[in-house]
């Protein structure tokens, strides 16, 4: 099932007029001024979607906390509440040419998400943008107090068991942020019905990982392994990608 679902993500990208650009393709592109039409449109899209993304991230975090049976752990609910308060406080999307194909947050300015202009231009769909917004909002929610460290640990343990990989530390945090991204994008799809096929809309939250050069680093799993790990953690999403319902 995982092989079929992973193939469906990248197959949909090939025919989708709103397909995300793969990460390795973005990395090879020249820098894009913040005044370029693609960057301006991307920044406006991200700013428009930010309020809804914040609300859906809150839902996703609460669901994951329940799914991973963390609610009964001492102090965890208070930490999640602090994380959600930090998420709710985010107000600004700031495009940045030097950030290129990345999005990032800085603890000294937790109300702002910085988006590279190449990244903004490479995510032409609402679903793709929502997934990345959610990823960055989780980092903000975790903050300097490690509010979500127990969730990162739990996701890393489950992902390690299901994939036979060793996923801990920063890669577990990044994978959890991606997991919240896919869950949040799926909630967005449910909240905004359209005539587009379900697999196409779902795939947009993952399609930027459909790379030719599949390389990870000390902090991240490789893009294609990320797709497989996320689909392994979310079998419902895998079935929807394969069967369209």
Regions found by a protein language model. Name each.
Residues 2-231, 235-244:
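A Zn2+-metalloprotease active-site environment signal
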């Amino acid at each position: 099932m995982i092989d079929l679902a992973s193939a469906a993500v990248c197959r949909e990208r090939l025919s989708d007029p709103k397909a995300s650009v793969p990460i390795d393709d973005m990395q090879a592109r020249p820098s894009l001024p913040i005044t370029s039409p693609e960057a301006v449109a991307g920044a406006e899209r991200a700013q428009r979607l930010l309020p809804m993304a914040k609300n859906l991230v809150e839902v996703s975090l609460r669901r994951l906390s329940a799914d991973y049976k963390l609610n009964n752990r001492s102090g965890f609910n208070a930490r999640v509440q602090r994380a959600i308060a930090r998420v709710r406080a985010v107000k600004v999307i700031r495009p940045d040419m030097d950030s290129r194909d990345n999005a990032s947050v800085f603890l000294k300015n937790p109300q702002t998400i910085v988006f590279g202009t190449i990244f903004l231009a490479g995510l032409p769909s609402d679903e793709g943008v929502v997934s990345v917004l959610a990823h960055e909002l989780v980092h903000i929610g975790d903050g300097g107090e490690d509010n979500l460290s127990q969730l990162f640990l739990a996701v890393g343990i489950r992902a390690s068991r299901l994939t036979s990989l060793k996923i801990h530390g920063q890669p577990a945090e990044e994978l959890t942020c991606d997991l919240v991204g896919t869950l949040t994008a799926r909630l967005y799809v449910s909240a905004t019905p359209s005539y587009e096929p379900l697999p196409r809309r779902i795939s947009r939250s993952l399609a930027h990982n459909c790379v030719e050069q599949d390389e990870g680093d000390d902090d991240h799993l490789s893009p294609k392994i990320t797709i497989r790990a996320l689909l392994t953690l979310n079998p419902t999403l895998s079935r929807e990608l394969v069967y369209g319902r």
